[in-house]
Swiss-Prot record:
It is found in: Mitochondrion. It comes from the Eukaryota. GO terms for biological process: mitochondrial translation. GO terms for molecular function: structural constituent of ribosome. The keyword Ribonucleoprotein applies. It comes from Homo sapiens (Human). Component of the mitochondrial large ribosomal subunit (mt-LSU). Mature mammalian 55S mitochondrial ribosomes consist of a small (28S) and a large (39S) subunit. The 28S small subunit contains a 12S ribosomal RNA (12S mt-rRNA) and 30 different proteins. The 39S large subunit contains a 16S rRNA (16S mt-rRNA), a copy of mitochondrial valine transfer RNA (mt-tRNA(Val)), which plays an integral structural role, and 52 different proteins. InterPro entries: Ribosomal_mL63 (IPR016576). PANTHER family: LARGE RIBOSOMAL SUBUNIT PROTEIN ML63, MITOCHONDRIAL RIBOSOMAL PROTEIN 63. This is Large ribosomal subunit protein mL63. Belongs to the mitochondrion-specific ribosomal protein mL63 family.
Amino acid sequence: MFLTALLWRGRIPGRQWIGKHRRPRFVSLRAKQNMIRRLEIEAENHYWLSMPYMTREQERGHAAVRRREAFEAIKAAATSKFPPHRFIADQLDHLNVTKKWS
């Protein structure tokens, strides 16, 4: 009985990586270095993003002309797929051959 208790004593109950009594995962030196590097990159990104390239006045409407031209190009491409307009006067013009009163 004491031998069984001794052999089963150091075991983690259930799944060893999840749950209330899980095995603790120790942080390695490489994991610390990776975390420090990622935090430094994030701090640099925050620094560069905190200083805008353009002022609010410059930024407002700076792409309006380009967007309008792109929209006009899309609209022209869409309308070019349609056939030209056909009018009833042109379709029925052959019936006007025998008009006597004009």
